[in-house]
């Protein structure tokens, strides 16, 4: 049954388009741990219930949110903190967008 299936680090990496080394790094930093670590082989295994958390971490990284902030979000799981984190990042991205638009306008002016 799929709900009880264990996924190796390689399978998890491939399914989520993420490097195995990134999963190891997230584990090392306390951001995303495997469900099971075999004590004899030290192989990491993940379960299907971890998929949504990994997708959330990937989304937050795509927004350029620092790992320190992502770890705090995961540790706290506080809706108010999550909302604040996203609002803050949105403002930073809008500021960056305005800077890019300004630079493009200057470039366009110099071209013509």
Give the residues covered by each predicted segment.
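Basic helix-turn-helix/winged-helix DNA-binding cores
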Residues: 1-63
């Amino acid at each position: 049954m799929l709900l009880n299936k264990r996924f190796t680090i390689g399978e998890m990496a491939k399914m989520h388009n993420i490097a195995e080394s990134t999963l190891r790094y997230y584990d090392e930093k306390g951001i995303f741990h495997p469900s099971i670590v075999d004590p004899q082989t030290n192989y990491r295994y993940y379960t299907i219930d971890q998929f949504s958390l990994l997708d959330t971490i990937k989304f937050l990284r795509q927004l350029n949110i620092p790992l320190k902030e992502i770890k705090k979000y995961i540790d706290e799981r506080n809706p108010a903190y999550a909302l604040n984190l996203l609002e803050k990042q949105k403002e930073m991205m809008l500021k960056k967008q305005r800077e890019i638009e300004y630079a493009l306008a200057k470039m366009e002016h110099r071209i013509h």
